[in-house]
A protein has these predicted regions:
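Alpha-helix boundary/N-cap detector
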Residues: 1, 13, 27, 46, ...
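N-terminal interaction modules that seed assembly of large macromolecular complexes
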Residues: 2-66
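Generic structural signal for well-ordered, non-membrane alpha-helices
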Residues: 27-31, 53, 57, 78-82, ...
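A broadly used, surface-exposed interaction patch
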Residues: 52-86
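Charged, low-complexity interaction regions
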Residues: 64-68, 116-117, 139, 143
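Extended amphipathic alpha-helical scaffold segments
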Residues: 81-118, 122, 129-134
């Protein structure tokens, strides 16, 4: 169904029918529920902190109580990419998205400065993340706000 057909269909419905359909979508589909929960109660700071914790655990996992060793770092870029994509889908402020993009790179740099990493793919991945972050920041017109962090990341490499 095209957008035009959908608009026509929705225009023919009464207010009560529209409300019923939205409630049904809200109950049936988790992404719709997540979206509306965020729209009516946007806790961006809480989301940002949770995302930063998840990303930092990818590089610096926490030892569980009673465990003999700390788990090995997984260093998955995909975890941060999924979080960033989720933030964009929710319509989170571009400053917060840019912050999480740069945080991902900064934590990866911190890890690589403390640990020797053989895989060249890791460094290519971080470079891709950096390029995406800079492109996002420039395209949203917020470069001056993040210039110091971008320069710090560039100087670290």
């Amino acid at each position: 169904m095209s957008k035009r057909d959908l608009k026509k269909y929705l225009g023919e419905l009464t207010k009560e029918q529209l409300e019923e359909q939205l409630i049904e979508l809200y109950e049936k589909f988790a992404p719709v529920k997540v979206y509306y929960d965020f729209v009516f109660n946007p806790k961006e700071d809480k989301l940002l902190q949770e995302a930063k914790v998840k990303i930092s655990h990818e590089y610096f996992p926490i030892k569980k109580p009673g465990a003999k060793w700390r788990p090995k770092a997984k260093m998955r870029r995909s975890v941060a990419q999924k979080l960033i994509k989720h933030f964009m889908m929710l319509g989170v402020d571009s400053y917060i998205v840019a912050d999480i993009m740069l945080y991902n790179i900064e934590i990866a740099q911190t890890f690589s400065s403390q640990n020797f990493i053989k895989q060249e793919l890791f460094y290519k991945s971080i470079l891709n993340s950096f390029e995406q972050a800079v492109n996002f920041i420039v395209s949203n017109g917020i470069f001056n706000d993040f210039k110091l962090r971008i320069n710090a990341i560039q100087n670290e490499t």
